[in-house]
Amino acid sequence: MKLQRFWLAILVRGAACACALLPWLCCIAQDPATYHQQAGRALQSFLLKFWKGNAQYLRNAYPSDGTLTGYWTYAHGWEAVMDGVERTGGQQYSGLIESFYAGQNASGWTSGYYDDECWMTVALTRAYDLTGDTKYLNQATALYADITTGWDTTCCGPSRGGLWWDKAHTQKATAANAGAALAGARLYQRTGNSAYLNFAQQVYSYWSANMVDPTTFQICDHMNTSGTKVWWRFTYNEGLMIGASVELYEATGSPSYLAAANNIAGYMIGHEVTPTSYGPVLYDGSNTGCGGDCHEFKGPAYRYLMRLYAKDTTKTQYYTVLKASADALWSLALNATSIVFSVNWAGPIQSSVDQAQDNAACIALNRFAQQYGPYPGSGIPRNQYEAENATLHNVSLEAIYGTFTGWGYIAAWNADGQSVDFNVNCTTTGPHTLAFRYAAGAGNASRVIAVNGVNAFPNRGFSSTGAWDAYSTNTVSCNLATGPNTVSVIYNSALGSANYLNLDNLVVGGDAPEVIRITSISLPSPGTLRLAWNTIKGRSYQVQFRNAAGTGAWINVVPPIIATGPAASADDTVGASAQRYYRIVEP
């Protein structure tokens, strides 16, 4: 299903050159595809090693120690996956958003720690942004209601206020207070409910007044019940307050929040880095000195320093740390044999790692690649749906046998309750073909094939391929609707499902090319042009321009946009008078 491209020329005022927006594209002779490849390999290795299908959760360690990761590190692992979805414009990993949601839904949404709930709230709002599914936002608001109960004015010290870190009321920590400000500001921007903003500002104001050094701008880690402030130094604390400041700046437009974020970032890059041959790298301690929760800390710190840098790309001192950290991760902290990363981003490498340190590395590599340059594409045809990017229910990921497509396949499923959902987006209603690429090395297998919740093929046989590294195709015909459809492959012993089956991909045939029509062109503010066009939910689109003569390379206006409904829009900020030709293409 190839995309029909639409382009037009528009005279706009005020074209800002790309170099001013993204200086590293102009001064660094590095192919963006290299960074995207590194980010992809890191995230794919992370998923292959840590996703535990029969638990619908993440393992704690590699090699596995038999335990599962914790609540808050699962939230960051989920965010790392969504970084991959965003970076690739929805071409990869999209179905896994729901897989991770299902895993936490089965485990329960509340925690004994308010800071952990803040991170899960942020992850839920991110899932809503990428999918448009309000169930994620509804769960975020329900969870935030629990967070607000942690506010207390009876303890601690001379100026009493702030959120408890935990429900046992042992301390008040930056993790909970900056986290609540950050999450509340995000909820306000998505719901318009001023109660979220008011609470976020209340928490932020208290913490800024009482727990930030007014001279150095270091953030205090926590305050115990006696009122004693504990000034542990971690990138995490500064990163969270940077994130809260940026979110509140976006929610209110007040420059004071941006100024605070820059002050705090100055402390971070001045005191929480270590020198390497690539430049200063974010640092919370050595592989042995940074233990426990510390393994996760640099991930969110990097995320929010990057968010701040995106607000003002003249802050090259931030970019120096961001790029050096990404380069050192790949060159100094990567175990090239197993594709895992050490706690210390400056190395040395480690053989045994945990999920937290690995997802922190994935966060940094994916955020940097997205900011550095455009995604070159997955190379996967639009009508080919990779099983490893689908929504998984109690099935495992694997990348061992034969010439599989994409970055893996699903495996180890032969029990009731196991299934995979492909989210298929069509341009036409009517007959389509579904071709499943699979391996059945243990003999003949069978599965239920359901379409939009109806068992279209209750006991479809998959003939033996004779070996796990030999693949075959099983094709059926069915009717699909215009827009999103769900094609499920299910193990149900009552309907005759049997034996093991590795599922590689689904190719959908019989669809027509998509015709994109620009539906409106507007100027929402001086110097900003907005294009709107029709979409199919779940597909991704790339808006590009080139110069007035209609020659030269096409330049991406924004990263690929994942449609969350029947229409989408993109803004192009311009400076001096210029004529531009625009088009919307398949990324």
Predicted regions, residues:
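Bacterial N-terminal signal peptides
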Residues: 13-24
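Low-complexity, Pro/Thr/Ser/Gly/Ala-rich linker/spacer regions in secreted
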Residues: 28-31, 369-385, 507-525
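CBM-like carbohydrate-recognition segments
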Residues: 31-80, 84-115, 119, 127-128, ...
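Extended ligand-binding groove/face enriched in aromatic
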Residues: 94-190, 197-201
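Active-site cradle of extracellular carbohydrate-active enzymes
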Residues: 180, 184-188, 195-248
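Extracytoplasmic
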Residues: 377-512
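Short, composition-biased motifs enriched in small/polar/acidic residues
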Residues: 512-587
